[in-house]
Regions:
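A short, exposed helix-loop element centered on a Lys and neighboring polar residues
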Residues: 123-124, 167
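Rossmann-fold cofactor-recognition segment
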Residues: 42-61
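Active-site Tyr-X3-Lys motif and surrounding loop/helix of classical short-chain dehydrogenase/reductase
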Residues: 66-70, 92-102, 106-113
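Conserved glycine-rich cofactor-binding loop
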Residues: 6-8
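Conserved glycine-rich Rossmann-like NAD(P)H-binding loop of the short-chain dehydrogenase/reductase
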Residues: 20-37
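C-terminal helical subdomain
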Residues: 182, 195-298
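Catalytic loop of short-chain dehydrogenase/reductase
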Residues: 87-88, 99-107, 137-175, 186-189, ...
Length: 300
């Protein structure tokens, strides 16, 4: 199951799992036309897998529960859940440069509802099937904003929660041989975002595929509950962006990742009495809206 599959990292993940890994992927989103085009792309790729498109509003708990019941009834097991649905980018982009008290409350809700809460609900409903099978992997798609101020209060709070969601779920799932991890891509090149040298949706999809198909039990046991980085997974499991074969882009991304890893390796600023507060204008100013040019084309 891949949520948020109409665009961005969710769409790329669904496509790679079906076309390159041969999975039967239940791809969920609210936009039927986008799901149908994804289904067509996968069918035309001549891969061994398939995409089952499911129009689903993740704010509707009963609809989500009914969807999981249908999948559980028709499939022997659910091997993988990727929680990628997130409405925060669309919600926050028109308000760059404003502090949280000048932004609509709906900006916070965009990150928390179709983001953290949606991931929690879907995971809670899928977990029983995985526990019964004594096997399964849950992946949350998150961001460096989980451990440093980036863009918006809601953005940071939501991604910190996503990181913690995997850790605490893994703690309770470990005795059942079910794993939960968080995946941190860097900035992306998607329908919404335009980060320079950003990661493509298919690159992130290959990171998920590596965890599901290439990682052995020893690695997954150690990774359980942890936050993993796409560029490091690319080096470990030998995948790359389309057209990049010499490893130079992966290496550049690993090097660019280091400052963020340094932050995450230290005691987080909120737990360090002597740590200075960041300057919000470093990442929350009107110029940053240019990194999200596609946000205006979608509704929250």
């Amino acid at each position: 199951i891949v949520t948020g599959a109409s665009r961005g990292f969710g769409r790329g993940t669904a496509r790679i799992l079906a076309s390159e890994a041969g999975y039967k992927v239940y791809a969920t989103a609210r936009t039927q036309s986008a799901l149908q085009s994804l289904q067509k792309e996968v069918a035309e790729s001549n891969g061994a897998g398939e995409v089952i498109s499911v129009v689903l509003d993740q704010s509707d708990d009963e609809a989500v529960a009914e969807f999981v019941r249908r999948v559980s009834a028709s499939e022997e097991k659910i091997d993988l859940l990727v929680n990628s649905a997130y409405a925060g980018l669309i919600a926050m982009t028109p308000h760059f440069g404003k502090p949280f008290w000048e932004r609509p409350i709906s900006v916070f809700d965009g990150s928390m509802d179709i983001g953290v809460r949606g991931a929690y609900v879907m995971s809670a409903l899928v977990a029983p099937a995985m526990v019964k099978a004594k096997n399964g992997l849950i992946v949350q798609i998150s961001s460096y904003g989980g451990f440093a101020y980036v863009f918006d209060v809601g953005y940071g709070v939501a991604h910190a929660a996503m990181d913690r969601l995997s850790f605490d779920m893994a703690t309770e799932l470990q005795e059942h041989n079910v794993r939960a991890v968080t995946l941190h891509p860097a900035g992306g090149q998607t329908e919404v975002t335009a980060f320079p040298q950003g990661e493509s949706p298919t690159y992130v999809g290959r990171a998920v595929m590596a965890l599901a198909e290439k990682a052995d039990d020893v690695y997954l046991t150690k990774a359980n509950g942890k936050t993993l980085f796409t560029s490091e997974l690319a080096q470990k499991f030998d995948f790359s962006e389309d057209g990049q074969t010499d490893g130079s882009l992966n290496q550049a991304r690993v090097e660019a990742l280091q400052p963020f890893k340094d932050i995450s390796a230290k005691r987080l600023a909120q737990y360090d009495f002597n740590a200075p507060l960041p300057n919000p204008s470093d990442t929350n100013n009107p110029d940053f809206a240019a990194l999200f040019p596609g946000a205006k084309n979608f509704k929250q």
